[in-house]
């Protein structure tokens, strides 16, 4: 069964990059052309890199590793939480607290505190033995911990790899992973730095449908890895057929998009078709609180 098709990538807008004035020259090799002032990403390369990332994730999970899903921008929050939960993986979709990886011991203590508060159950009323003020404080603490660390509830150790939507916004998460030697799988938009990612997937990291589709692909790889892990425990090596289908008939304008562009020594060739990408990347915050802020 195919993981994703060329048509799905096109329909989800994965090929739309940023405006030409907002680009990283290191991404030039992933750019197909330029139209209406925006860059168009080469989806043939995207398919190739999806295959590589898929096999890596599947193999990592099959060997017992976990994948941390990271995406705190509005367009990715729902997909990150939904897909990570579906395959039983940890996730961060509210806010990345500095030290979540590099200071995991402290984060783990806060996770234990969150579970303690949840075990207390309903703190309303005096039956629990707390005053109204104490009850209010405990509920606030529980709510704050749940929002920031709820997705890490069952994470007992550092992840084997992380999946990131928007490496520029999640630069602290990427930096921490690199310091610890944790592989990074990520969507690479035309304004990103490919040198920061171990398993890049060239694509649109701003559109909701694009982030959702690519996160589903990673979740599917995790699911296949879990099946393989289970098969090994039973003495078999189950490997579901998984690949990328590119032979589905395409519309004329889609075939035209995939035609070889004219080579240029400078920037990708210009054209005047296709609509301009409207999803702008949210302004990233200049500050990230420390892990201790969750206390």
Swiss-Prot record:
PROSITE patterns: RIBOSOMAL_S2_1 (PS00962). It comes from the Bacteria. Gene3D superfamilies: Glucose-6-phosphate isomerase like protein, domain 1, Helix hairpin bin. This is Small ribosomal subunit protein uS2. It comes from Salinispora tropica (strain ATCC BAA-916 / DSM 44818 / JCM 13857 / NBRC 105044 / CNB-440). The keyword Lipid metabolism does not apply. InterPro entries: Ribosomal_uS2, Ribosomal_uS2_bac/mit/plastid, Ribosomal_uS2_CS, Ribosomal_uS2_flav_dom_sf. The lineage of its organism: Bacteria, Bacillati, Actinomycetota, Actinomycetes, Micromonosporales. One of its GO terms (molecular function) is structural constituent of ribosome. Keywords: Ribonucleoprotein, Ribosomal protein. GO terms for cellular component: cytosolic small ribosomal subunit. Pfam families: Ribosomal_S2 (PF00318). Residues 252-287 have a biased composition (Basic and acidic residues). GO terms for biological process: translation.
């Amino acid at each position: 069964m195919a993981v994703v098709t060329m048509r799905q990538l096109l329909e989800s807008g994965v090929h739309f990059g940023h405006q030409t004035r907002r680009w990283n020259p290191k991404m030039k090799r992933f750019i197909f052309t330029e139209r209406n002032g925006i860059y168009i990403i080469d989806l043939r390369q995207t398919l190739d890199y999806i295959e590589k990332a898929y096999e890596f994730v599947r193999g990592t999970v099959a060997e017992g590793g976990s994948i941390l899903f990271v995406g705190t921008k509005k367009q990715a929050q729902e997909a990150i939480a939904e897909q990570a939960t579906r395959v039983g993986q940890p996730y961060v979709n509210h806010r990345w607290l500095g030290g979540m990886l590099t200071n995991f011991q402290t984060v783990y203590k806060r996770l234990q505190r969150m579970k303690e508060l949840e075990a207390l159950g309903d703190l309303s009323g005096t039956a629990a033995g707390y005053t109204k003020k104490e009850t209010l404080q405990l509920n606030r603490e529980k709510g704050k911990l749940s929002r920031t660390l709820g997705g890490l509830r069952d994470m007992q150790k550092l992840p084997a790899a992380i999946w990131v939507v928007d490496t520029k916004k999640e630069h602290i998460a990427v930096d921490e992973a690199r310091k610890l030697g944790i592989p990074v799988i990520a969507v690479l938009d035309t304004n990103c730095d490919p040198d920061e990612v171990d398993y890049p997937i060239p694509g649109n990291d701003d559109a909701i449908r694009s982030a959702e589709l690519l996160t589903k692909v990673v979740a599917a790889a995790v699911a296949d890895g879990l099946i393989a892990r289970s098969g090994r425990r039973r003495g078999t090596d189950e490997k579901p057929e998984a690949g990328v289908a590119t032979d589905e008939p395409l519309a004329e304008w889609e075939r035209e998009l995939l035609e070889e562009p004219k080579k240029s020594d400078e920037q990708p060739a210009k054209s005047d078709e296709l609509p301009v990408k409207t999803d702008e990347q949210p302004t990233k915050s200049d500050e990230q609180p420390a892990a201790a802020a969750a206390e």
